[in-house]
Amino acid sequence: MAGKLAVIGAGLMGAGIAQVSAQAGWEVVLRDVTDEALTRGTDGIKASYDKFVAKGKLEAHDADAALARITATTDLDAVADADVVVEAVFEKLEVKHEIFRALDKIVKDEAILASNTSAIPITKIAAATERPERVVGTHFFSPVPMMQLCELVRGYKTSDEALATARRFAESVGKTCIVVNRDVAGFVTTRLICALVVEAAKLQESGVASAEDIDLACKLGFGHAMGPLATADLTGVDILLHATNNIYTESQDEKFAAPESMRRMVDAGDIGRKSGQGFYKH
């Protein structure tokens, strides 16, 4: 499957989705609100292609062809004829509602409207449109070119046809899919990692064990490639705190009640690798 894809948001996730899709033969429109954001996104895509070429995993002419299939724009109307639209912006329902309302007015009827959200129920996002049956979750993982999984999420009104189209799209860009049949906040993967990170942070906060030993226990005891606190630093403590707060608000399940230490870290700006300090010093 290949066609025209629109990606809304040129950040790390949006650029990654655009990258793998263009490489798979999709014509991609990458849209963001500023030229600066688009430049950062397209520069990141080119740099990633260059790394794959240098490692012998991609031919230079294929990288050039993929780049040529990406059009960066601030014009939302440029996505009107897309077959698949993937929104990849900040995890805030109000922002997503604004985008989906706008897309609903301009995108052709047969297109699917997908969200890369990792935690917000698709049913809530779809409520901003007049076509909730065409709205589906396509949760990719970072870094998109390296991670194999795509979590497909069915909203309350998502049609079988829309879900099948989303699966064909994800598989066409090299991903293996799991299906979330009931879109509880956090779906499958975010609920699992948030529960693990929250418990690990509570253990560290209460002095049961150090961050290093907690992570080592998960790596050597459970075969995890990375421990939960190192994962939090990589993902961003702020992002995981935001996600677990969303899940807790929705579920009132105490295992998602983040410890005070995580809140204080975020307030202090100690959010992981991107700030130089999180559960570890970087």
Give the ranges of each region predicted by the language model.
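NAD(P)+-binding Rossmann beta1-loop-alpha1 motif at the extreme N-terminus of oxidoreductases
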Residues: 1-51, 55
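Structural/interface elements that position substrates and couple domains in central-metabolism enzymes
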Residues: 29, 172, 189, 193-199
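Rossmann-like NAD(P)-binding element
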Residues: 33-40, 51-113, 120
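Rossmann-fold dinucleotide-binding core
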Residues: 115-182, 187-191
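NAD(P)-dependent Rossmann-like dehydrogenase/reductase catalytic/cofactor-binding core
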Residues: 161-164, 171-182, 201, 205-206, ...
